[in-house]
Regions:
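Beta-loop-alpha module in the N-terminal Rossmann-like domain of NAD(P)-dependent dehydrogenases
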Residues: 18, 48-105
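N-terminal Rossmann-like dinucleotide-binding module
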Residues: 1-48, 136
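C-terminal helix-rich "cap/oligomerization" subdomain common to oxidoreductases
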Residues: 1, 64-67, 113, 205, ...
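Rossmann-like dinucleotide-binding domain that binds NAD(P)(H)
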Residues: 149-209, 215-220
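NAD(P)-dinucleotide binding in Rossmann-like oxidoreductases
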Residues: 188-192, 204-256, 266-269
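Conserved acidic residues
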Residues: 31, 63, 139
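A contiguous active-site-proximal alpha/beta segment in oxidoreductase catalytic domains
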Residues: 72, 95-150
Length: 294
């Protein structure tokens, strides 16, 4: 069987990680790297024997695509790929606005194109073991995700950091809905007006509660998930330094989604992207309102 030709949109640090995963696969080969910065695209592509370009033409001739460019560019790239019929793995957040996220998802649904969001923690072995250990016996979920500030970002701490844990909450209690959200922020950045630390509490329709904290201005790194069961037993794990490679596991799932999943399974994958983005939007609006009306 011939290798799947992969188009990589973006040439930054996250794109480089995806390139390494593709390069290690026996069933895929990196065909082209697309970036507006052609020198950067060439630098990354040359490491894997791929072509480089600043336009999407070559990408549209590939079999599957990974979108790992800056967040503001996600929507346009994804829509062009979807209209060409290419299965797409798009880094989180899916786009820079809830409106654009819905448009991308609805377009993929209309054309029945496989779409996956890069919620890589879903594939973290530590999280999978924790979820298996507790099953559905959950009373409260607590997450902490802190670390140093990224060199540059086009996303808020909610879209860039907290959204991972919002997604994990929905993975732990599938089908549940949020009935109450309370959010607070601190450490507002003077240059972009965004907070660097966010805490959030959730109440679900089932009565399950969750507390989440995200910070990207800490000298230390923590990625912890704790689950308290109805009998008050607590199960905790760290998501740092997983025993496997979550990004590689995610790419394997993307392969299955693109080649073997049924329409029902593709529908479910697409549907699972929206809840965390909708909740992130609610939190962002709460924080903005609180700052404007202290």
């Amino acid at each position: 069987m011939s290798s799947l030709l992969v188009a990589l949109i973006g040439a930054g640090s996250m794109a480089a990680r995806h390139a390494r995963v593709v390069g290690s696969c026996t069933w895929a080969s990196l065909a082209v790297v697309v970036d507006r910065d052609l020198d950067r695209a060439a630098w990354l592509a040359d490491q894997w024997g791929a072509a480089s370009t600043s336009t999407m033409t070559a990408a549209l001739r590939c079999d599957i695509a990974v979108v790992a460019t800056s967040t503001p560019a996600h929507a346009d790239a994804a829509l062009e790929l979807i209209h060409a019929g290419l299965p797409v793995l798009i880094e989180k957040p899916l786009t820079s606005s809830l409106k654009a996220t819905r448009e991308v998802l609805e377009t993929a649904q209309f054309h029945d194109v496989a779409l996956m969001c890069g919620f890589v923690e879903r594939f973290n072995p530590a999280f999978l073991r924790l979820a298996q250990d507790v099953g559905s016996a959950i009373s409260h979920v607590r997450t902490v995700r802190i670390g140093p500030a990224p060199p540059r970002t086009h996303s808020t701490v909610v879209d860039d950091v907290l959204i991972h844990d919002l997604d994990l909450v929905f993975r732990l209690i599938p089908g549940d809905t949020v009935t109450e959200v309370r959010s607070e922020a601190s450490g507002w950045c003077e240059t972009n007006g965004w907070p660097e630390t966010v805490t959030c509490s959730l109440r679900m329709a089932s009565g399950i509660t969750a507390s989440l904290r995200a910070c990207r201005h800490s000298p230390t790194r923590r990625r912890d998930v704790s689950i308290i069961q109805p009998d008050e037993r607590e199960h905790s794990t760290s998501l740092l330094s997983p025993s496997g490679n979550p990004l590689a596991a995610q790419f394997e799932h993307f392969r299955w989604l693109a080649q073997h999943a049924s329409k029902v399974e593709r529908d479910a994958e697409r549907a699972g992207v929206l809840p965390s983005h909708e909740l992130a939007d609610v939190i962002e609006r709460q924080l903005t309102e609180a700052r404007c009306n202290p």
